[in-house]
Regions:
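Phosphate-binding P-loop
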Residues: 2-9
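Hydrophobic anchor at the beta1->P-loop junction of P-loop NTPases
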Residues: 14
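The conserved Walker
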Residues: 18
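Conserved lysine of the Walker
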Residues: 22
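Conserved substrate/cofactor phosphate-moiety recognition/catalytic segment
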Residues: 27-71
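Glycine-rich phosphate-binding loop used to anchor ATP phosphates in small-molecule kinases
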Residues: 60-110, 125
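A glycine- and Lys/Arg-enriched "phosphate-lid" helix/loop adjacent to the NTP-binding pocket
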Residues: 98-165, 169-171, 178
């Protein structure tokens, strides 16, 4: 944790289906709160290894790669760290792409203070790495994401609307989180 921090570093994870503005929102939030983002590792892994790299072992490597990037980002964060996805969403990807998940995912409990579940009310953009352009597949993935958060009993907030509405809702949620007494 950065020496400028006092108290516990809060973590907020952007969560949801592809092409819902998670990366853009994470970066905008980091600028607003003058902190950093732990980048999405799954995209990097897919760009290097291709879209066929989707076995349970690939998903485990992606999850652990994300944790490494998060640890590095934590050393530069101030008060709050924004994560562009995390191992929990990788578990959902593993279920869908690999037909199941490594048991490591079910033991994973290192949750952020808040998940921001981005709605699918934004247009899907094909970029060569994304999988689910079909509206029904996208909806199915979104519902699987929310079900995973509910199953784990974690704190989350659904955000939707245009990019400015999402940013305003996210800023309000993070402000409220930062105002809470630390545990």
């Amino acid at each position: 944790m950065n020496a400028a921090n006092t108290g516990k570093l809060r973590r907020v994870t952007l969560f949801g289906a592809e092409s819902t503005g998670k990366t853009t929102l994470a970066n905008r939030l980091a600028r607003h709160f003058v902190t950093v983002v732990a980048p999405e590792y799954g995209r990097t892994y897919t760009e290097i290894h291709g879209q066929d790299a989707c076995s349970k072992q690939d998903m485990l490597k992606i999850a652990k790669g994300h944790l490494k990037l998060r640890r590095e980002a934590e050393t530069h964060a101030h008060r709050v760290l924004f994560e562009d996805t995390d191992p929990v969403i990788t578990a959902v990807w593993s279920d869908i792409l690999a037909g199941g998940r490594d048991k490591w995912f079910d033991r994973f409990r290192d949750y952020p203070d808040l998940y921001l579940l981005c709605d699918i009310d934004m247009p899907w953009v094909k970029d060569g790495v994304r999988y689910f352009g079909d509206p029904e597949e996208r909806k199915k993935f979104h519902l699987a994401c929310e079900a995973e958060l509910k199953k784990r009993g974690v704190r989350y907030l659904k955000i939707g609307g245009d990019p400015e509405q999402r940013l305003a809702a996210a800023i309000a949620a993070v402000d409220a989180l930062l105002a809470e007494p630390q545990k």
